Regions:
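Vicinal oxygen chelate
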Residues: 1-3, 87-128
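A short, acidic/glycine-rich surface segment
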Residues: 40, 60-65, 97-99
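Short, charged/polar surface micro-motifs in flexible loops or helix N-caps
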Residues: 48-52, 59-61, 83-85
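N-terminal beta-strand motif that seeds the catalytic metal site of vicinal oxygen chelate
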Residues: 1-18, 73-78, 126-128
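Exposed loop/turn and edge beta-strand positions of beta-sandwich/beta-sheet ligand-binding modules
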Residues: 39-41, 72, 106
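Core segments of cupin and vicinal oxygen chelate
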Residues: 13-52
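Mid-chain, well-packed structural core segment of small domains
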Residues: 69, 75-88, 92
Length: 128
């Protein structure tokens, strides 16, 4: 049997590293961390005690190929504090959001996409 410890990181394909770094670093406010000197461009960010790795594949597109927000599509989830505060922050930066404050789960959800169409769910323990 495999004995899993924890999720270590999530890797996402991006097409424009500067644009992705602006979104993840400036808009979402994730702290960028040191990255080994790989032979391809990318960036690493801290997500609490986990990591997000952005990887550039020149000349290709990301998996989805669209920026439409679809909660049923592949996505990763980040738990945040303050539903309204998070929503206000995203909207003040012009980020399109799909709100699900009340749903079948026990946590309020906000879905967004990054500039390449990767879906991100931000959820909170409870509605403010």
């Amino acid at each position: 049997m495999i004995e899993f410890e924890t999720l270590h990181h999530v890797s996402l394909s991006v097409t424009d590293l500067d644009r992705a770094k602006h979104f993840y670093g400036e808009v979402l406010g994730l702290p960028e961390t040191a990255r080994p000197a790989f032979d391809f461009p990318g960036a690493w960010y801290s997500l609490g005690d986990r990591q997000l790795h952005l990887i550039v594949h020149p000349g290709t597109r990301t998996l989805r190929g669209t920026r439409a927000i679809d909660a049923r599509d592949a996505h990763f989830v980040v738990r945040v504090r303050g539903y309204r505060q998070t929503l206000d922050h995203l909207q003040s930066h012009g980020v399109a959001c799909r709100e699900r404050p009340r749903n079948l789960t026990s946590w309020p959800q906000i879905f967004v996409t990054d500039p390449d169409g990767n879906v991100i769910e931000l959820n909170t323990q409870s509605l403010d």
